[in-house]
Regions:
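An amphipathic, basic-hydrophobic helix/alpha-beta surface used to engage anionic
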Residues: 13-272
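Generic alpha-helical secondary structure signal
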Residues: 217, 222, 238, 279-287, ...
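Short beta-strand-loop
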Residues: 265-290
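Von Willebrand factor type A / integrin I
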Residues: 1-29, 47, 288-365
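Generic detection of short hydrophobic beta-strand segments and adjacent strand-loop junctions
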Residues: 93, 144, 275-278, 359-365
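Short, structured coil/loop segments at alpha-helix boundaries
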Residues: 70-72, 98, 149, 173, ...
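Intrinsic-disorder/low-complexity, polar/charged segments
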Residues: 1, 62, 172, 209, ...
């Protein structure tokens, strides 16, 4: 009789617990995700913090979330991905009443892009797994922008780093106060700060420096994903990613040399042509590259010829394959007095102004 009474008490306790969790399990339970940095480069690590708050006295022995994130983000654990390239990373919590729980994860960003990370729902239950409940989570996702990392000079053959920046011209309005080309005898009309004391000591008389005239370089960067001239389709994903990294490399060089540049991409819905310089403008263009989807809009020759190159001093072409036709178009620009350079995986025309990208990929072109 005592055993039956004990079993009845246990059953009653389980039923009470079941209804308590079914009625009150959802109350006062919240989830949010926080990210250390919202903008990083490829290869960087970022901290993701999950925060669950149980704002009631009833403890929650089992709460489960699933972080939904692209497979390009490495959480350090194995997770299966679906056909869309999305993986789910489970997290299990046990929370006391009136308690906040934090879980910190390190994420390695292996590919550029703009991603959303976070849980879509919370799943919880009582101690026996009977009183189950699900809470949809809204506004719990965070956005992460992964900027493309530039190639290095070692990824090109030959290592042809053109010195973009100030270029010599024959006539200009003002002298360049920083560029010196020889010295001449001081006539008394030059300012005192133009006297070269080293040259004066060697010549035995006052000598003033000669200053050159310069003009700032302004380049247009043409980014093309077309596989070949006869195939109006983008190259493989790996090759297109290399093209984006090469564009990031050229923009980095332009910033180092204080040169003004504009980035034009051969894709549909191209943004209006805008030139600029400096770290801020380069960051804007890197954000464009982070969001771009490799595609083809025009044939490479048409893409090159429709650009207003007359507004620039240099033309930089980045393409999977530099063909004879593309080389002829660039040679025309060269004959017009423009600086010309190309970066390509394959240099079919053996153009001397082309640097070949030597980094290996699994699927070429």
């Amino acid at each position: 009789m005592e055993i039956i009474f004990i079993l009845i008490l246990i059953a009653a306790a389980i039923i009470i617990e079941y209804f308590s969790y079914m009625r009150n399990g959802r109350k006062g339970l919240s989830y949010r995700a926080e990210i250390g940095r919202s903008e990083v480069f490829e290869g960087d690590e970022v901290i993701l913090t999950e925060v669950i708050v149980n704002d009631k006295l009833l403890p929650l022995p089992f709460v489960k979330t699933e972080i939904v994130a692209p497979a390009f983000l490495d959480f350090g654990i194995k997770a299966e991905k679906n056909k869309e390239g999305i993986c789910c990373i489970p997290s299990v919590f046990s929370i006391k009443g009136r308690e906040k729980c934090r879980r910190v994860r390190k994420i390695k960003c292996t590919c550029r892009g703009i991603f959303e990370i976070g849980a879509s729902s919370l799943y919880g239950s009582d101690l026996f797994g009977l009183g189950e409940f699900i809470i949809p989570v809204t506004d719990a996702k965070v956005s992460l922008t992964v900027l493309p990392s530039p190639l290095s000079a070692d990824d090109f053959s030959p290592d042809n780093r053109q010195l973009y920046g100030d270029i010599l011209v024959r006539r200009f309005i003002c002298e360049d106060p920083f560029l010196i080309n020889g010295a001449h005898e001081y006539s008394g009309r030059e300012p005192m700060n133009s006297i070269s004391w080293n040259a004066s000591a060697r010549a035995g008389k006052l000598m003033a420096v000669n200053r050159d005239y310069t003009s700032c370089s302004k380049m247009i960067i043409l980014l093309n994903f077309q596989r070949r001239d006869d195939i109006v389709a983008p190259a493989t994903e790996e090759v297109c990613e290399l093209m984006i990294k090469a564009a990031a490399f050229v923009m980095e060089m332009a910033e180092e040399m204080k040169a003004e540049f504009a980035l034009v991409i051969n894709i549909p819905d191209q943004e209006p042509l805008t030139a600029g310089s400096g770290a801020g403008f380069r960051l804007e263009q890197l954000r464009r590259l982070a969001a771009v989807e490799a595609d083809c809009y025009l044939r490479i020759e048409d893409f090159i010829m429709e650009q207003p190159v007359g507004e620039f001093t240099d033309v930089i072409l980045i393409t999977p394959t530099l063909s004879f036709e593309s080389t002829d178009r660039l040679e025309d620009f060269k004959n017009q007095g423009l600086g010309v350079h190309a970066y390509a995986m394959h240099n079919e025309s053996d153009a001397d102004f082309c640097s070949q990208i030597t980094r290996r990929v699994k699927e070429d072109i």
